[in-house]
């Protein structure tokens, strides 16, 4: 997450859900980006944060037209799914890339009874933490960038090269296979 969030420049605004993973906070600090917090709906019966809909994102984009990207966690740690399709439509309307932390949804693409992956719903990039639900070793994850993404792929590659080791763990890489 830190790698992708080092793409925004200092002072640029990023809409991010308030219950994001701490690595996203690290990425915001490294990049110097300014978070614009979106609070998910609350599920009082469960005492957990719920979903986010496109209306909340559109409201924030209207208030912050200079936003550089939107970052949403979907699903939450508790398994709550947001309306990624409506969020994606709003982001496309405003020309802002949508990035999704789909850490706990890495296997969704392989079962028709599970929610659709954010890439199919229009996200520009998705991070899958295969060590959480995919069976790979801890610390292993994948970044997927959509073919029609509006992200600057060369900037993402530069950020990855800046922050990644030149000696990656072959055991971790093999466990992703």
List each model region and its residues.
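Conserved PLP-enzyme active-site core in the AAT-like
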Residues: 2-177
